[in-house]
Amino acid sequence: LPATDQRSRNAALADELGLAVREAGQIALKYFRGPIKSWTKGHDSPVSEADIAVDEFLRARLSREGFGWLSEESQDDRTRLASERLFIVDPIDGTRSYLAGREDWSIVAAVVDKGRPVVAAVYAPVDDELYLAASGEGATRNGGRIATTAGSALAGARIAGPKQMLERLTTIDPETIHEPKIHSLALRMTRVAEGRIDAAFASINAYDWDLAAADLLVHEAGGAMTNLTGEALVYNLHDPVHGAILAAGRDRHAAMLDLVRKRRKQFA
């Protein structure tokens, strides 16, 4: 497709994803803080009947001819690898928080094209905050434009992430301000996109569904989100799992990456 057609198609898809994750949020809220069946899967990872209900809703609403599908709660059949474009979904990102009745969980959907996100939606149902982005169109929260914070200073920067990584950062600059951990990883990185925090780390073993939507939101908000060697993340690979990650406004990201690179072993 010509670039302008592609952009308008992505913008239309962003609106569609926005409606879908909002509706999915209403499904999740019906179960929230009420009696709910939950169990564990894999490495002690919680899953609930709400995760499954939201997953089924999003799959029915979004999946279509010509697009692959990858979701935390769907069986990965790997036919997605033959698709240039696919939906990547996390029905409830932050299930532990959701089951504990906390507010830091979200519903996440992205469209990835040739390994990079081109459309993103992150919805925080408790606060009714909808974050949307389409490639080249900027990023919004509830319709208003958002941007990462400017500047490159580490001193006074509000940073979220795993405790261990933040403690290592303190040894470099004790003036950094550690934000409370945001359990939904997509929401943690999206807080960087909207400038509510200045930077965020993710430890190793985050998955495509945790990262793809937030990646686009951060970039469209004027920031950068990469692995700790500064490379862009590639999605829809055979194994959809990533190493440690840093997100921040562009200048701060470059400065922090420089510091982290010099101490790579401490942060990996």
Each language-model region and where it sits:
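Residue-level signal for inorganic ion chemistry
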Residues: 28, 51, 62, 95, ...
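An extended, acidic
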Residues: 149-268
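A structural micro-motif at secondary-structure boundaries
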Residues: 141-148
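N-terminal subdomain of lithium-sensitive/metallo-dependent phosphomonoesterases centered on the IMPase/IPPase/PAP
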Residues: 1-92, 265-268
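DPxDG-like acidic metal-binding loop motif
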Residues: 81-140
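Short coil/turn connectors at secondary-structure junctions
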Residues: 65, 83-84, 115-118, 154-156, ...
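Short loop/edge segments at beta-strand edges and connector loops
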Residues: 71-73, 143, 229
